[in-house]
């Protein structure tokens, strides 16, 4: 492993200190809690939506979350290892066949729905034991 890769790995470990980022994929509905600083106040803002893209580039990894806010589509890009991310919670697993769900931008209503991924009983039992 070269020097830059080692430095990036150290930065990732430092950014993850005390935090765990769950496994999630495009199509999943997630709640991203973001630390927001307004003047001298600090608060946590929740942003819930569907992951439409995930970019795995080491320290530069990011993901895009799309939600509908008062009838208007809103997309927000988050850096995976940002210190501003308080936590990520996977609310629902989506069953999709694409890595990038940009086609959801043109869709609205029922055509923009995503099927829920069903987990077999064997895997559910194994996951609950861990």
Curated annotation (Swiss-Prot):
Presence of the UniProt keyword Ribonucleoprotein in the record: yes
GO MF, one example: structural constituent of ribosome
PROSITE patterns per UniProt: RIBOSOMAL_L19
InterPro entries on file: Ribosomal_bL19 (IPR001857), Ribosomal_bL19_CS (IPR018257), Ribosomal_bL19_sf (IPR038657), Translation_prot_SH3-like_sf (IPR008991)
Keywords: Ribonucleoprotein, Ribosomal protein
Keyword Ribosomal protein recorded: yes
Pfam families: Ribosomal_L19 (PF01245)
GO biological process: translation
Sections of the chain in a coiled coil: none
A single Gene Ontology CC term: cytosolic large ribosomal subunit
Family: Belongs to the bacterial ribosomal protein bL19 family.
Biological role stated in the UniProt entry: This protein is located at the 30S-50S ribosomal subunit interface and may play a role in the structure and function of the aminoacyl-tRNA binding site.
Protein name: Large ribosomal subunit protein bL19
Organism for this UniProt entry: Burkholderia multivorans (strain ATCC 17616 / 249)
